[in-house]
Amino acid sequence: SKLRRDNPGLISCTITGYGDTGDAAQKKAYDFLVQAEAGICAVTGTPDAPARVGVSLSDLATGLTVFSAILRALLQRGKTGQGVDLKISMFDVMADWMNMPLLAHRYMGGAPDRMGLKHSFIAPYGAFRCANGALILISVQNNREFTALCEQVLQQPQLPTDPRFSENTARYANRIALEAIVNAVFEGFSSAEMVQKLHPPKHPRCILTECLIIS
């Protein structure tokens, strides 16, 4: 308070694990613990087991949130001359990142299932193994992308008019049959050949990259 009196434009920021009041304020707030308690682990992993995100998500996200909040405070001070005391908890940051699962739980009958590299609402989506054992990921988001995939990659232009696959809701409901079709094609080509087939930018795809390649 003395610093504030001496400098009304002061901007301060306090980072906590679970806030600064109540019993939770005394809890340890390691990244893994915050991920788990905020629900991140419950929607991450495979149907068999939850998992933590493979990087320190809570730490990184909190840092980004603090950065954004301080920038906003600087803009506000530039207009008003007044500073602000910011209080940001790691748990609140992660709870905010749970926006989609929480909305699904409230309005769509339940939180999304853990799906590994697959998606709980979209198909075809996920990793498909090629003839040489390598995995290629595709992420088809709409009917236009699905039609392009069927015509140019799968060489089955009739699929988009098949009632089982004509819309995303139908594709997801029949995803086992659809994934079998996609798998049958991918298994007939090496990953290099499939990358070439998927080369046009209209095809949402990537390879599953290991740390060795990135480094």
What is the predicted function of each stretch?
Residues 4-5, 187, 199, 215:
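Alpha-helix boundary recognition
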Residues 93, 144, 209-213:
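Alpha-helix/helix-capping structural signal
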Residues 14, 42, 90, 161, ...:
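Structural signal for conserved beta-strand scaffold positions within catalytic alpha/beta enzyme cores
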Residues 124-205:
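Aromatic-enriched alpha-helical interface/lid elements that frame and gate functional surfaces
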